[in-house]
Design a protein with these regions (language model features):
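Conserved SAM-binding loop of SAM-dependent methyltransferases across substrates and taxa
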Residues: 58-70
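Phospho-regulated, low-complexity intrinsically disordered regions of nuclear gene-regulatory
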Residues: 387-393
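S-adenosyl-L-methionine-dependent methyltransferase catalytic module, highlighting the catalytic core
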Residues: 4-15, 60, 79-125, 129, ...
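Conserved class I S-adenosyl-L-methionine
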Residues: 48-57
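Class I SAM-dependent transferase core
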Residues: 2-31
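Conserved SAM-binding motif I beta-strand of class I
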Residues: 73-78
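Conserved alpha-helix/loop element of class I SAM-dependent methyltransferases that forms part
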Residues: 30-49, 64
Length: 393
């Protein structure tokens, strides 16, 4: 539940008109961004594949996490169906995602439902986040919350954040930070609850927070308190998860999938494009050398590669090891007016080597899109073309 950052970065929800500008506490970055960045840092550190955000609201956290390359399944759950439908499109792939596909598949799904209902589609997750959620639960739902999230879903890691009520006296005219909050806990109250839940469901927990207090008020602690729960022994095995009976109580209101290199058609597009660009770069770099040969022609292959790998001021920067690998690979050559680039040469370039494991794989993917030599060992291109004459290479 992100706070609006209006006249300052105050965390006081809905009370901006009551907070004098000169006395309002400012957080830079705004507190909601600090919370989301905290989660993102955890994702960067632990690299979970399956992540769910319970009480996802306007999907701000999901939009931040979707760019992380390790995540393959991203789920949001919220009780407000209209908000999910309104914000769903912001999670869809953009044109740039098709031009530069991810390495791994990514599916994003938004579910309408209550966080205290059991849905088997959220079993087996690596990380579940509950950011500023539990304070919105009434006593009955709060009692059921651990049973569902810790007991039934039982992910590897759970992150729960909630307001620290000890910080509230630093805000003018504030008792609860949001009119929908059912409670706000002190650090002792939150930690007592968290330790009890962790012990009952076999988790360990550590405490931290975001939103540092102003000088002289360090004793109140962070404005937002955070508990990080780790499942002892890791998450449930796939076999255990599959034994659970299917329970689909949530309503899927939005789902989308991102293009990735795991999908054959996108992998081919990327590889063909990378090969074409590298061949063109090599061809253009050798045109001046070719002109120095005074128009000499013949069927005998001419090694025009030189001893050094070409380095463009606008191109990638290679390490010494990468340069050596390129220099030691088979060099481009000419036969008549044709320019040949061995596949082994292309595989020496880091970007292409990352895409293709070997020559046979590269040949099988590009063969019907890029001209190859008769033995299939090299890409063939015209040495000169119309544009070379126009731009006087």
């Amino acid at each position: 539940m992100a706070e609006n950052n209006l006249q300052c970065s105050s965390v006081v929800d809905g009370n901006f008109e009551e907070v004098p500008r000169e006395t309002a506490i400012q957080f830079k970055p705004p507190l909601y961004r600090q919370r989301y960045q905290f989660v993102k840092n955890l994702v960067d550190q632990h690299e979970p594949k399956k992540v769910a955000d319970l009480g996802c609201g306007d999907t701000s956290l999901l939009r931040l996490l979707k760019v992380n390359p390790c995540i393959e399944l991203l789920v949001g759950v919220d009780i407000n169906e209209d908000k999910l439908r309104w914000r769903g499109d912001s999670l869809a792939p953009f044109m740039g995602d098709f031009l530069k596909p991810r390495d791994l598949n990514l599916t994003i799904t938004l579910y309408h439902g209550s966080v205290v209902e059991r849905d088997s589609r959220l079993l087996g997750f690596d990380l579940i986040t509950c950011i500023e959620l539990i304070e919105h639960l009434d006593s009955g739902d709060l009692a059921r919350f651990p049973e569902v999230v810790f007991g039934y879903l039982s992910p590897s890691m759970i992150v729960i954040s909630t307001p620290n009520s000890e910080f509230n006296p630093l805000f003018p005219s504030v008792t609860l930070r949001d009119s929908d909050h059912k409670f706000e806990w002190t650090r002792m109250e939150f930690q007592t609850w968290a330790l009890y839940v962790a012990n009952r469901y076999d988790y360990s927990v550590e405490f931290t927070g975001v939103g540092e207090p102003p000088a002289g008020a360090e004793n109140v602690g962070y404005c937002t308190q955070i508990g990080i729960f780790h499942k002892n022994g890791g998450k449930a095995t796939e076999a255990c998860v599959s034994e659970q009976h299917d329970q689909h109580v949530y309503k899927a209101v939005f789902t989308t999938s991102y293009p990735s290199l795991q999908q054959e058609r996108f992998f081919k597009l990327v590889l063909v494009n990378e090969v074409s660009q590298q061949v063109e770069s090599l061809r253009v770099s050798h045109l001046p050398r070719r002109k120095e040969q005074d128009g000499e022609r013949g069927d005998k292959p001419k090694d025009i590669g030189g001893s050094k790998a070409p380095v463009s001021c606008f191109g990638p920067v290679f390490t010494e090891v990468e340069k050596a690998k390129i220099e030691n690979s088979p060099k481009p050559f000419c036969v008549g007016d044709k320019f040949f680039v061995p596949l082994q040469r292309l595989l020496a370039y880091p970007r292409l080597n990352r895409l293709c494991a070997n020559e046979e794989m590269m040949r099988s993917v590009i063969a019907d899109s890029i001209p190859l030599s008769s033995d299939g060992s090299a890409v063939v291109a015209d040495l000169c073309n119309y544009f070379d004459e126009q731009f006087e290479f």
